[in-house]
Amino acid sequence: MGGRGMNPAKMKQMMKQMGIDVKELKDVKEVIIKTADSNIVIENANVTIMTVQGSETYQIVGDAKEVPKSLEIPADDIKLVMEQTGVSEEEARNALKNSNGDLAEAIVALSSA
């Protein structure tokens, strides 16, 4: 082969003959992969979808960074804990964080304090 690559058009034709369809997903800004502990954010992502025998495979290329998940506590939950226990917003928020968002546990902890 002497270091020469294959003609892209010929490569595409061969893949089509083998039942492989490849297409690029346009205008992708970022891709987020959510795991139990963190999110992997891939910015400036180029996404290619390869379909082989009905199964799709996604190839993602870009600038990846891992972002730890933070516990998001809804304002309604904070308000409910405040109303039930008579504590400040900050105390209610801290109790919910300490209980991993469990309303009952936060209320019991504040009530018994």
Swiss-Prot record:
- HAMAP family attached to this UniProt entry: NAC_arch
Q: Fill in the subunit field for this protein.
A: Homodimer. Interacts with the ribosome. Binds ribosomal RNA.
- High-level lineage: Archaea, Methanobacteriati, Methanobacteriota, Stenosarchaea group, Methanomicrobia
User: What is a GO molecular function of this protein?
Assistant: RNA binding
Q: Any S-S bridges, and between which cysteines?
A: none
Entry's CDD domains?
NAC_NACA, UBA_AeNAC
InterPro entries found in the cross-reference section: NAC-like_UBA (IPR044034), NAC_A/B_dom_sf (IPR038187), NAC_arc (IPR005231), Nas_poly-pep-assoc_cplx_dom (IPR002715), UBA-like_sf (IPR009060)
**Domain NAC-A/B per the UniProt entry, residue ranges:** 5-73
Instruction: Alphabetically list the UniProt keywords.
Output: Protein transport, RNA-binding, Transport
Q: Which gene encodes it?
A: nac
The job of this chain, per UniProt, is described as: Contacts the emerging nascent chain on the ribosome.
Q: Which biological processes are named by the entry's GO terms?
A: protein transport
* SMART domains, A to Z: NAC (SM01407)
Family that this chain belongs to: Belongs to the NAC-alpha family.
Matching PROSITE patterns: NAC_AB
Q: What is this protein called?
A: Nascent polypeptide-associated complex protein
- Note the NCBIfam families from the entry: archaeal-type nascent polypeptide-associated complex protein
Q: Keyword Protein transport, does the record have it?
A: yes
UniProt KW RNA-binding keyword? yes
